[in-house]
Amino acid sequence: MALPTLPSYWSSRKHMDLRQRQHQQEDQFRQQWEQNSRYFRTWDIHNSKQIEWSSKISYQRSMHAYHCEKMKEEKRKILELRRERLRELLLEEQDLLAAELDELRLSMGLREQRLREQHQDLKSAREEQRKLIAERLLYEHWKKNNPKLRELELDLHKKHVINSWATQKEEKKQQEATEKQENKRLENQYAAARREAEARMRVEEERRQLEGRLQAEALRQQMEELKQKEMEATKLKKEQENLLRQRWELERLEEERRQMAALRRKTELGRFLKHQYNAQLNRRTQEIQEELEVDGRILQALLEKEGELQQVELARREQARADAAWMKQVIEEQLQLEKAREAELQQLLREEAKEMWEKREAEWAREQVARDRLMSEVLTGRQQQILEKIEQNRRAQEETLKHREKLIRSLEEGKQLAQRAKEESEELKLARKQELEAQVAERQGQEWEAARQEEEEEEEARQAEEHSNALLQQEAKTMAEKGYQPKLHGHLRIAWD
């Protein structure tokens, strides 16, 4: 009986189905990748718009538009109020003008009389004022031209000059002491302000350094978190690739299992038929050989017995030969019969083996169906788990990507804030340095101006004193040469400053 074989187109059909499934998987993976890319692009656009709408510039633009609209509304209300107020004032002014016109019409004569009285009063007041001025001028003229009063005034002037000079010296000393105290106070105030500014700058520098350290620590933590997220993303990508390889490996193992099951069925069928045929043939051959050996021993015993009895019973020898030949013929006939029976038995065994094989094949088919169903459920469950893990991996990658973008934006904002804080710190340092330099320059200018003014005052005082001494000497010399001459007009004497 020939062994069952499978058609050649089955294997080619299997390979075609396998390639088709692989292409379908690749198409499905590519579609999934395009869907993920489209999803990420959509989220990027959404995030950029969200950032733009929630940015400070958008907020300032909205608040500026709101304030402009509010100011326009307030201006419009104020303009309406002003118009209403002007309208009321115009009506009131018109009423007042009408009343005033009425009064003018009624009191024109009374007004002329009042004007005449006012003119007369003004004329009397001018006359009175002229009299007073004339009296005052006459008094001053008498006061200036009276010799006794002039001598008295000269004595008072000398006393005043002497007292004023001493007073001026005392005031000069007090002024110098006051200026020294003021300079000392200003120096102390300047030193205190400088110490306060230095302390404030130290505190600000410490605060800025602390903020820098905290910001650097935050940036370092964010960088570590970013590295961790990148490692998680790499791990998730590797895990996804591993899951895809496991999925392809399961499909390959399933295909190999089906092929091995078909090959095993063919091999088992051939092995069973061959083993059954060989076992029956060997067993029957041994039985025939044993029977032939038994028959041979029997015939040999008969022949030996015939030789022993040849001398005793010569008459019976022929009969023994005839019996031996007959037995040999019977054995040969029996051997032929056994061979025919063996052939018939072998044919019967093949049919029974075929029936047994068909029976076992049916049992194997049922068992194979059950095993295939169980394996299909197991493989389907495993594939479903792999797909769920792939989906979870995709979502985890999306979350990791979002968090990574958020961290990158936070890092950029941190860098911008650090740069802005650094620029503000530099500007503040420069402003404080310029302020201190301006204070120092102002203080030096004040000291220089005070010193210059003091020198000028001393020089003016010295020159005034020299000029006064020269004038006094010259006047004394002139008066001594001319003698006493009365003066008609005197002049106002003042003390030297």
From Swiss-Prot:
Residues 67-140, 166-271, 327-479 form a coiled coil. InterPro entries: CFAP53/TCHP, TPH_dom. The keyword Cytoplasm applies. Expressed in all tissues examined, including brain, liver, small intestine, large intestine, lung and heart. Found concentrated in tubular structures within hepatocytes, and in the apical cortical region and desmosomes of the apical junctional domain in enterocytes of the small intestine. In the hair follicle, localized at the outer root sheath. Also expressed in blood vessels (at protein level). Residues 167-188, 441-497 are annotated as: Disordered. Its main location: cytoplasm. Residues 168-188, 444-453 have a biased composition (Basic and acidic residues). Residues 72-457 are annotated as: Interaction with keratin proteins. Keywords: Apoptosis, Cell membrane, Cilium biogenesis/degradation, Coiled coil, Cytoplasm, Cytoskeleton, Membrane, Mitochondrion, Tumor suppressor, Ubl conjugation. One of its GO terms (biological process) is negative regulation of cell growth. It holds the Pfam family TPH. Residues 258-424 are annotated as: Trichohyalin/plectin homology domain. Disulfide bonds: none annotated. Belongs to the TCHP family. This is Trichoplein keratin filament-binding protein. It comes from Mus musculus (Mouse).
